[in-house]
Amino acid sequence: MRRQGEKSMKPLISIIIPCFNTAEYLPQCMESLEKQTIGFDKLQFIFVDDASTDDNKTWNCIVQFEHIHPNEVIAVHLDENRAQGGAKNIGISYAEAEYIGFVDSDDWIEPDMYQKLYECVVKYQCDAVDCCIIKNFPNGSEEIFTKKGDIYDYFEKSITEGGTHWIKDFMHVGYGGYLVTGIYKKTIINQNNILFPEHLKYEDNYWSAILSVYLKDFYHLQDNCYHYRQRENSTVYLRNVSYHLDQMEIEELKIKTYQELGIFERFEKEIEADFLH
């Protein structure tokens, strides 16, 4: 592993970027990070190369970016592939800010994304906030994706207080697994040891579901700030038998964790509905 530079001030947000053979897309991702209106120097960027197999192209791209921004960027290289869940866990261990965010290395974000998200957590003093995505297709077209539903309309207007109804609302609406659109309070993650499953796909679905159990308040911003690249060889598109098996294992792991936390029986109906969704 590799680390350079020390910030004189604690960053506002630590952003974790797992990378695997994405040298082709990293420049656009990095450029969008550099343009953040909240201030590049107010952010911490943790790039985790998950043992890429592209003759160091991805790693060299990350190291070059670290050399340009030694005080804001941390480059971490894994000798063994741990899949996105493992890479994200490593990234969290390096995070110094009060809030944590994630960006996929083949995506990019709007210049004001983190400014808008951070302004929300400051204004509403909430544990987490997220926004909406824009799906970008290879032919240049895009699709504006906005979360709908009564509970999200409510998020847009005010804070949802934590408690039993929060879990029921989560199960009813579903978070969608778009973890990359938000920022999350690090103390909640660390104090409750909320880790991503490793060597499994759909790790975001597990992590966001377990995180929701501990959130006292949450804000949803309807602004579309995250560009979600649609490419045929990405993790989401390569859905074969092993991917479906991973998805089933993730759902079983969620139920097991709910049982360990003592909430399964209380919300069994909602949890089973989510499992069958």
Give the location of each predicted region.
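Donor-binding/catalytic cores of nucleotide-activated saccharide
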Residues: 108-219, 229-242
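Cell-envelope/extracellular polymer assembly enzymes that use nucleotide-activated donors
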Residues: 11-14, 44, 206
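A conserved hydrophobic helix/loop-capping motif in glycosyltransferases and polysaccharide synthases
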Residues: 13-25, 29, 36, 48
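Acidic donor-binding segment of Leloir-type glycosyltransferases
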Residues: 30-77
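Acidic metal-phosphate-binding loop of nucleotide-sugar-dependent transferases
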Residues: 82, 107-108
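C-terminal subregions of glycosyltransferases and related glycan-biosynthesis enzymes
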Residues: 229-277
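Glycine-rich, basic loop-to-helix element that forms the pyrophosphate-binding segment
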Residues: 77-95
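Short aromatic/hydrophobic "clamp" motif used to bind/position activated sugar donors
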Residues: 100
